[in-house]
Regions:
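Alpha-helical linker/hinge and terminal dimerization helices associated
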Residues: 42-43, 64-86, 101
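Beta-alpha-beta core module
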Residues: 160-166, 171, 232-281
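Central regulatory/effector-binding core of bacterial HTH transcription factors
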Residues: 89-153
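Flexible hinge/capping segments at coil-to-helix
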Residues: 157-173, 177-199
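Hydrophobic hinge/microswitch elements
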Residues: 135-138, 145, 204-261
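A short LG(V/I)-centered, amphipathic sequence patch enriched
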Residues: 40-57
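Secondary-structure junction motif
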Residues: 102-108, 151, 190-191, 195-219
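Short helix-boundary/capping micro-motifs
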Residues: 10-28
Length: 302
């Protein structure tokens, strides 16, 4: 199996089309198809499922892709170090639920370790995608929460994927809403208080489920609900629609200056925020330092 074959497969997976990948790689489509078939035969697996509408990765293919990406990254590091005679790049990656404190901790990590040359990866994404990223070694670790509401299913999925979850700290849920919201003057807000207003939840794609939701109490039916895929949209909907979302309350003043506030939720629930690794995975120096930065955001009185 040649490195070039791995690069071909990564490109096909990236663009989702053998035809388009062949154009970008400046080779013929038959040559690319033959290379993929040869790799599949050598690996003893089917990497892509072909159909009239395009290609999709198989489960084995997704796992293969994770290892292939590691090989290519290591080759690039070798070339950087010994072919170009430049200092090697510092590399590190995180997949996280939509928390600003994880992003801020990442900024501090880059400031601390970012030398002249580095290749860092930070991905805010859905819960199940975080598990996939860690499992397929797209990233070094994943950040998510476990609660009483989702614990049984989450721990089952984590175990089935040969991953492990370690708690960093716990936090009480808070409601995020704009400072001009009718509920903004309350010291504590209940789910009942929130009923008249639009609820904002992050999209989880094909894994839409209360167990993979990033927001507590998402199983409670509401009349008004908006699903979004980025924090910028959430801010706009809070400001324009008196909408709200439920999160950890950690670092509450990050949103739109002073325009967004957080209020403790009355319901008795706890978010156990932690990190996910592959079984028997040892964190490198950057991983350990990133966890140190995250712990700085632990609530004083969870």
């Amino acid at each position: 199996m040649r490195v070039q074959q791995l690069k071909y497969i990564l490109k096909v997976a990236e663009v989702g089309s053998i035809t388009e990948a062949a154009k970008l790689l400046f080779i013929s489509q038959p040559s690319l198809s033959n290379s993929i078939k040869e790799t599949e035969k050598e690996a003893g697996i089917t990497i892509f499922l072909r159909s009239r509408t395009g290609i999709t990765l198989t489960k084995d293919g997704a796992e293969f892709l994770g290892y292939a990406r590691q090989v290519i990254q290591q080759m690039e590091l070798l070339e950087d170090r010994y072919v170009t005679n430049l200092p090697g790049k510092v590399t590190f990656g995180v997949s996280s639920q939509h928390y600003t404190f994880t992003e801020n901790a990442f900024v501090e990590l880059v400031k601390r370790f970012g030398q002249k040359r580095y290749a860092f990866y930070y991905n805010e994404t859905g819960t199940h995608q975080i598990l996939d990223d860690v499992k397929n070694r797209v990233c070094d670790l994943g950040i998510l929460y476990v609660s009483h509401e989702n614990e049984v299913v989450m721990r089952k999925v984590i175990e089935e994927n040969h991953l492990m979850f370690t708690e960093l700290f716990s936090a009480k849920p808070h409601v995020f809403l704009q400072k001009a919201h009718p509920l903004a003057s309350k010291k504590v807000v209940s789910v009942h208080d929130l009923a008249p207003y639009p609820r904002l939840n992050f999209v989880q794609g094909e894994y839409e489920s209360v167990y993979f939701s990033e927001e507590l109490f998402s199983s409670i039916p509401v009349d008004k609900e908006i699903r979004v895929n980025d924090r910028g949209a959430i801010v706009n909907f809070m400001l324009g629609l008196n909408a709200y979302t439920i999160s950890s309350g950690i670092f509450p003043k990050y949103l739109n200056g002073e325009n967004i506030i957080s209020i403790p939720l009355a319901e008795n629930e706890t978010m156990h925020i932690g990190y996910v690794l592959n079984e028997n995975q040892e964190l490198n120096e950057l991983g350990k330092s990133y966890l140190e930065e995250l712990r700085k955001y632990a609530p004083a009185n969870p």
